[in-house]
């Protein structure tokens, strides 16, 4: 039990590392005061370009993937695997290093689900890409893919604990996009540009 608790705390702290903020500061920019003010990959991409944006995406994704892979490697019961993934995600969304004001969690959730249900991720990515190509809104694509994940996990994994975790993560991703939803409804949301 002690090792499981240590893993969950470690997952939360790893998830809490503000990748986008650190990478932006390395090039002399406080990402919280530019663009949308969000520390996630989309704002970093828009503000600082493709290279730093992709580095942020990969870093945030690894924060979710690594703890889940460790839990899998230790052959922990499903409840601990789910709790570890959720802890990493919550670390990103509510980071202790920034007074619990983190990112929206899309990339970290991606990492968690790559470790838990790769087939669900492939299907969700297809939904994301289709939505992005058709409507050109990253936020809408993220929300749509997040909303689909619980159904995909239920269909593919059929494990109650993983389904519950995916519902919690999806709900928080959508909740963290509430300002984007308002802008989508008012027609003022930023369109994705390559």
Curated annotation (Swiss-Prot):
Q: Which gene encodes it?
A: plsY
Q: Which residues cross the membrane?
A: 4-24, 78-98, 110-130, 137-157, 161-181
- Keyword Nucleotidyltransferase among record annotations: no
Which cell locations does it reside in?
Cell inner membrane
Extent of the signal sequence: none
User: Under the GO molecular function aspect, what terms does this record hold?
Assistant: acyl-phosphate glycerol-3-phosphate acyltransferase activity
Task: List, alphabetically, the SMART domains matched.
Answer: G3P_acyltransf
The chemistry this enzyme catalyses reads: an acyl phosphate + sn-glycerol 3-phosphate = a 1-acyl-sn-glycero-3-phosphate + phosphate
* Pathway as given in its UniProt record: Lipid metabolism; phospholipid metabolism
Descriptive protein name: Glycerol-3-phosphate acyltransferase
Q: What is its EC number?
A: 2.3.1.275
Record keywords: Cell inner membrane, Cell membrane, Lipid biosynthesis, Lipid metabolism, Membrane, Phospholipid biosynthesis, Phospholipid metabolism, Transferase, Transmembrane, Transmembrane helix
Q: Which GO terms describe its cellular component?
A: plasma membrane
- Could you say which protein family the record assigns here? Belongs to the PlsY family.
Identify the InterPro entries for this entry.
G3P_acylTferase_PlsY
Record organism = Geotalea daltonii (strain DSM 22248 / JCM 15807 / FRC-32)
What are the recorded Gene Ontology BP terms? phospholipid biosynthetic process
Q: What does this protein do?
A: Catalyzes the transfer of an acyl group from acyl-phosphate (acyl-PO(4)) to glycerol-3-phosphate (G3P) to form lysophosphatidic acid (LPA). This enzyme utilizes acyl-phosphate as fatty acyl donor, but not acyl-CoA or acyl-ACP.
């Amino acid at each position: 039990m002690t090792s499981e608790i240590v893993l969950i705390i470690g997952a939360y702290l790893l998830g809490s590392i503000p990748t986008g903020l650190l990478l932006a500061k390395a090039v002399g920019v406080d990402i919280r005061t530019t663009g949308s003010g969000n520390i996630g990959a989309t704002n970093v991409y828009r503000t600082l370009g493709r290279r730093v944006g992709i580095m942020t995406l990969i870093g945030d994704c690894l924060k979710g993937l690594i703890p889940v892979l460790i839990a899998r490697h230790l052959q922990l019961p499903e409840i601990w695997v789910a709790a570890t993934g959720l802890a990493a995600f919550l670390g990103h969304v509510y980071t202790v290093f920034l007074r619990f004001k983190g990112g929206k969690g899309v990339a970290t959730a991606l990492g968690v689900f790559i470790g838990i249900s790769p087939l669900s991720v492939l299907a969700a990515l297809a939904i994301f890409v289709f939505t992005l190509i058709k409507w050109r809104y990253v936020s809408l694509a993220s929300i749509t893919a997040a909303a689909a994940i619980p159904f995909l996990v239920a269909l593919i994994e059929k494990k109650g604990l993983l389904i519950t975790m995916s519902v919690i993560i999806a709900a928080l991703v959508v909740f963290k996009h509430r300002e984007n939803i308002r802008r989508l409804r008012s027609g003022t949301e930023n369109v994705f540009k390559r």
